[in-house]
Amino acid sequence: MSSTSFAPRIAVAHIAILVMSCALAPVASADTVVVTAARMLDVLTGRVVEHPQITITDGRISAVGSAGAEIPAAARRVDLPGVTLLPGLIDMHTHLTSDPHFSGYRRLQFTDNFWTVVGVANAKKTLEAGFTTVRNVGSANYDDVAIKQAIEQGIVTGPRIVPATYAIGATGGHCDSTELPPSVSVPKPAVANGAEEIRATVRKLRKYGAEVIKFCGTGGVLSKTDTVGGQQYDLTEMKALVDEAHMLGLRVAVHAHGTSGIKDAIRAGVDTIEHASLADEEAFALAKQHGTWFSMDIYDDDYILAEGEKNGVYKESLEKERSIGLKQRQTFQAAHKAGVKMVFGTDAGVYPNGFNARQFVTMVKWGMTPMQAIQAATANAAEALGRTADVGAIAVGRYGDLIGVTGDPLADVAQLQSVAFVMKGGEIVKASAN
């Protein structure tokens, strides 16, 4: 790594000026953009590249080279002195249509469509925080599909969304409504029991726009009445779900805190384990054998315990979080040391969307290097999504999704909480300090 000193204020001011001048370029030059910077993280090799020059044509990267290379005629230039470029970040576990300030029973005061609007606002915050792709693993009323469609049509601003729609769950489980009495409880569309019901539910969610299937294999923290580690689907049910999803070309994420549920989910063939709090050495070995990824939300314990009570989180949930938060971090450390494949997943929505990058510091504190944490949110995440042709690295053929920080994220990974530059598909989204 170069010992070049950084000047954040000057660099950010310079970004703003240069981007404004670029915005005045002729429309005819907008199809090709050339971006230069002080350095770039090559997440595929783990190297730092000095003075990169990236050419983006029609939204995709067409060349990656060194500054001074030939620039296409009529190209629009974006020069970022003092800036470190990274690929757009990927969060593998978001809930865009959630707001932690309205937790527990407080959520019930709003109309269903209120949460669609919340999701639109959160999508913009998430993109401006440097997350150009998210996997949204649970959203009512197919809201994440609606927001994805609105983003793709240019109606609203947000990241690329891989939507799960509803999370599938067993009656009385973490993905069911467990806080209301029978007289007012409303059946959830993705509650399913037994192999055939589960298969039919997978088909229904795909019909209405799901691009990944998420199900609850064990209890959880923020549900009111279940035990956090208790298994809620047996191996036969899990295998039926996974087989159906894979047959339809969809990958599968499982919410699983408990040990037995994690192991059965891996045996059933899931692609990612969400939370993985109580995974043991046997689970690590199974994950390595099957190529299963862990997506562990190890920052949000801080937020839940600090803010949860005043936000309306159930007393029972706070007790569960106190019992499992530290253990999950210890499991993360052990799983990483054991060589389990890891992706970056935050559970944003449990804490505010837009603050997703807070988790990088926690991942480094619990055993990863800054580069490993960044790779979890870029190259690894793209591989787990099955979208390495499109996202996850600054490489020819992939989308022109770039972010820039004015510090050195390998020296201080907290720099990723203050992204100064965001580009999605070759279009500048943000070019100023937070």
Name every feature range the model reports, one short phrase each.
Residues 109, 247, 251, 316, ...:
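His/Asp/Glu-enriched, well-ordered alpha-helical/loop segment
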